[in-house]
Regions:
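Short, charged N-terminal beta->alpha structural module
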Residues: 1-31
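DNA-binding patch around the recognition helix
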Residues: 76-89, 95-96, 101-103, 145-176
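Short acidic low-complexity segments
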Residues: 24-46
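Basic, amphipathic DNA-recognition helix from helix-turn-helix-like DNA-binding domains
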Residues: 39, 43-83
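Short, positively charged loop/turn segments that connect secondary-structure elements
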Residues: 133-142
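Short amphipathic alpha-helical recognition elements used for nucleic-acid or partner binding
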Residues: 99-131, 150
Length: 176
């Protein structure tokens, strides 16, 4: 969901590795789709982190926990506009006016991957592997149940009508 750019490859590799250990939603190296891009520039005595909407300067040295906390605070306010809603992937939140709809981890993973792949869709098998990477058995009906539950949950919490098509093992969002 986020692409990291850095002026120091060693620093970037370490940051990506540590964020990955925290189960932070980074973009897949084989997939160029992401919601946001973060630029990290190391200077003499500080680390400059920026997104399209925010900029942060951190004094060096700093602990990874401090970096992660500040980075997460900054990136969690990034949003994607979806119809008349704001989707905050890092908060697992969909918002319209003052109405907040909180998503479970699986619901958020489904929503983010449907949005990231809104142009061409995503293969069901790929989505299953993202959600349940350790499952040896693949059950398409398990994914279908979660898709239906997400659609029903959004509809019950608001007037959000999640529409998608499923053809030949490919799921794609449908926008009005």
């Amino acid at each position: 969901m986020i692409n990291i750019n850095c002026n120091d490859d060693f620093l970037k590799d370490n940051i990506v590795n540590l964020l990955d250990q925290k189960k932070f939603f980074l973009n897949n190296p084989h997939n160029i789709q992401y919601f946001f891009q973060s630029n990290i520039i190391i200077k003499e005595k500080n680390l400059e982190i920026s997104t399209s909407a925010n900029k942060l300067n951190l004094n060096l040295p700093l602990s990874f926990n401090e970096f992660f906390e500040k980075f997460f605070d900054m990136i969690s306010n990034e949003k994607v506009y979806l119809q008349n809603y704001e989707y905050y992937p890092f908060k697992q939140l969909i918002k319209k006016n003052e109405k907040n709809i909180f998503l479970s981890e699986i619901q958020n993973t489904i929503m983010s991957n449907l949005l990231l792949n809104s142009n061409n869709g995503i293969k069901k098998i790929d989505l299953i592997k993202i959600i349940w990477p350790n499952d040896k058995d693949i059950f398409f009906n398990k994914l279908d149940t979660h898709l239906t539950n997400l659609k029903n949950y959004l509809n019950s919490e608001s007037d959000f009508d999640l529409k998608f098509t499923s053809k030949s093992g490919l799921i794609k969002l449908v926008f009005n």
